[in-house]
Amino acid sequence: MRRPALLASLLALLIAACGPIGLQAHTISLAYKSGDTYRYALHVALKYTVGAQGLSVPINLDMSGKETVKVQSVDSTGTADLSINLTDLSVKTTVNGTTNTTTTTTTTTVEVKVGRDGRIVSVNGSAFGSSGSLPGMVGADGGLVSAILPDKPVKPGDTWTKSYDQTNPMHSTGAYHVTTDNKYLRDEKVGSVNTAVVESKINADLDLTFDLASLNGQGGSSLLPTSGGSAALKGMSMKGTTKSDVTTWIDLGARRIVKSHSTGTIDAMIDLNMAAGATTPGLSGPITFKGTQTLDMNPV
């Protein structure tokens, strides 16, 4: 009769000494390898509203396609140069009630630098191709998003914070100031892959200036007017905030992104920089820019 009680006491002591069984801390930061290739199905949905002089213009975009991510190189800090090719894009845009749908088999290529903690260091190009030229959430224009990962081993339930500045995003002069609250939610299997599920709540203050060359360099059908006084447009400035909730599944073995889901909002004010004495019909500033965005990367 005493033996079961003794065994139970010993087990209780072991648990108290060793902590919860199975909740071992491990490293979940990214560890890409040069030459690796990963494929995803990409879906992006934007719902923006642009307001000026009492007018409100809804702008919606829904895009889906295939995404191939190739690791070009990895430096000594773990920052990876990724080449992202997007194909079979289907894009539906609705501006003020008028809908346009396009499909293409041509390839859009975006170059992205991503740190080992998942932060997007830089983006050259746009996943949205010719579908628009105003910025959205932090890093999302590259077609790849990640939760912000810890620098040290962690276990499910652990939390951490990070803040950083991302300078000159989207061919602009200026910066995002980013603060993040992050949590290792759980371990979960995605198909046959063991993953760590990490959630990041990301807030960013943005203060950006675009000159005309950088606006044209983004390509696409600008949301700014293309006739009349717009010929005198020299650039624009944007100030505001973005908020994102990003959940990412990290391969515990290969330490790469298995899939990612992001939702977010933007609330910004835009001022147009016109040549002296010139005006832009229908869009004299300031202009409000608000909306929501979702992005999903799923393995294929």
Task: Describe every region a protein language model picked out.
Residues 20-300:
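Signature of exported/secreted
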Residues 1-8:
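Bacterial N-terminal signal peptides that target proteins for export
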Residues 8-17:
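Bacterial N-terminal signal peptides
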